[in-house]
């Protein structure tokens, strides 16, 4: 006898037309939500970090940062549409942070841009390290300029054609099957065949920064 199993609830980003930023205890049971952004980037004290965006309203956001943020901290949130929004941390609780925008945003316009415009770029984090790149039987050492869940930008003094299949190894991460998306002026845009898990990328960024600070 087959037993029906209820599907797990989907943890997706939601949006609201409210002019107020999300509150710590805000629950929107019974309110219709639309899927919006999943991963964003924040700039705090000149440093770029990744975050998860749980909820966005016209007045603010509910995010899960991967760094310590105290109430009153000014920062800039970058959405996957490329829009950057100045804001201030208003509260923190159980790993979630509420931020208030300096000026209200048009949620409908942001949503429309995300659905109808070109596919947005994933937030990229600038790094300074080297990767081992395998192109068939050839192996190269290339400088990494930035990294995202979806790929890396590499500096190369060798010519690698667009579309070439590669294996990219970043120190401390599993080798990633990838392909060259573009090649120009000594730089390569490389796309991973599979997205890096956000938690793995954040842990790697932290470890990389700790090594740089200790050097």
Can you say where each PLM-predicted feature lies in the sequence?
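Structured alpha-helical
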Residues: 1-215
């Amino acid at each position: 006898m087959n037993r029906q199993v209820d599907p797990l609830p989907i943890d997706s980003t939601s949006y609201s037309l409210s002019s107020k930023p999300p509150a710590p205890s805000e629950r929107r049971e019974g309110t219709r939500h639309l899927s919006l952004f999943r991963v964003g980037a924040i700039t705090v004290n000149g440093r770029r970090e990744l975050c998860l965006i749980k909820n966005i309203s016209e007045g603010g956001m509910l995010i899960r940062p991967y760094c310590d943020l105290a109430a009153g901290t000014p920062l800039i949130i970058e959405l996957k549409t490329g829009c950057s929004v100045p804001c201030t941390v208003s509260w923190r609780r159980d790993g979630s942070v509420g931020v208030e925008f300096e000026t209200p945003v048009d949620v409908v316009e942001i949503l429309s841009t995300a659905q109808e415009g070109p596919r947005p770029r994933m937030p990229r984090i600038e790094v300074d390290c080297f990767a081992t790149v395998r192109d068939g039987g050839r192996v190269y050492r290339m400088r990494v300029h930035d990294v995202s869940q979806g790929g890396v930008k590499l500096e190369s003094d060798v010519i690698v054609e667009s579309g070439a299949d590669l294996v990219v190894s970043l120190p401390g991460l599993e080798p990633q099957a990838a392909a060259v998306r573009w090649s120009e002026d000594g730089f390569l845009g490389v796309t991973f065949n599979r997205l890096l898990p956000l938690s793995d990328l954040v842990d790697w960024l932290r470890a990389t920064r700790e090594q740089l600070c200790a050097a």
